[in-house]
């Protein structure tokens, strides 16, 4: 399965770094930064001294994964999503409270029926999630259910849970 991660409007450099390290651990094919997501050099559009500071902060949690992953920066996310869909990718929105499909309900048969072998996982900002103007590009919303008091997992933790499930955990549900 080919997996692309889009980090859209994620504020925290530490969340970005954690996602990059997790992405490297699961052999993600590509990272796309968009919106105000802090991106490491060479994708940063900031002044050089600020870009270096951001890159160093990301490196603290990425531990070099920012250098091992294929990555780019999208100046126009809607064009990027349109291009990816036209190229055969299906878009998954990792979101809560929009339950299309809860993660544990996705068995191997359901995944094969709903998704192609090329997927994009769209991650939104930490507080408000994915912007509603992007919903029309999303083929499937996946929710990771919570049983505690909080409404959602941290974006980097939710990403790790979903990537594990897509890479390895889905086989646990085979009958």
Spans of features found by a protein language model:
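Short glycine-rich anion-binding loops that position phosphate/pyrophosphate groups of nucleotides
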Residues: 96-99, 125-128
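Structured adenosyl-cofactor binding patch, chiefly the S-adenosyl-L-methionine
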Residues: 24, 132-175
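Short amphipathic alpha-helical segments
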Residues: 18-19, 45, 104-106, 133-136, ...
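Residues that form or flank phosphate/diphosphate-binding pockets in enzymes
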Residues: 14-15, 101, 129, 153
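RNA substrate-binding interface of SAM-dependent RNA methyltransferases
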Residues: 1-96
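Short amphipathic alpha-helix with an adjacent loop that forms part of the alpha/beta core around
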Residues: 80-86, 104-115
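Short, acidic/turn-prone active-site loops that include or flank metal/cofactor-
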Residues: 36-37, 126, 146-150
């Amino acid at each position: 399965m080919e997996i692309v991660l889009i980090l859209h409007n994620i504020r925290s450099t530490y969340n970005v770094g954690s996602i990059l390290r997790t992405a490297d651990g699961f052999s993600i094919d590509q990272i796309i930064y968009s919106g105000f997501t802090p991106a490491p050099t060479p994708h940063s559009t900031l002044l050089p001294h600020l870009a270096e500071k951001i890159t160093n902060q990301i490196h603290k949690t990425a531990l070099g994964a920012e250098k091992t992953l294929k990555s780019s920066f999208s100046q126009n996310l809607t064009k990027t999503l349109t291009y990816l869909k036209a190229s055969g990718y299906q878009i998954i929105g990792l979101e809560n409270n929009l339950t299309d499909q809860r993660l544990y309900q996705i068995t191997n048969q359901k995944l094969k029926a709903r998704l192609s072998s090329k997927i994009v996982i769209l991650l939104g900002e930490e507080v408000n999630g994915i912007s509603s103007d992007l919903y029309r590009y999303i083929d499937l919303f996946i929710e990771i259910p919570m049983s505690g008091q909080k409404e959602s997992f941290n974006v980097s933790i939710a990403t790790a849970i979903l990537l594990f499930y897509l890479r390895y955990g889905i086989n646990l549900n085979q009958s």
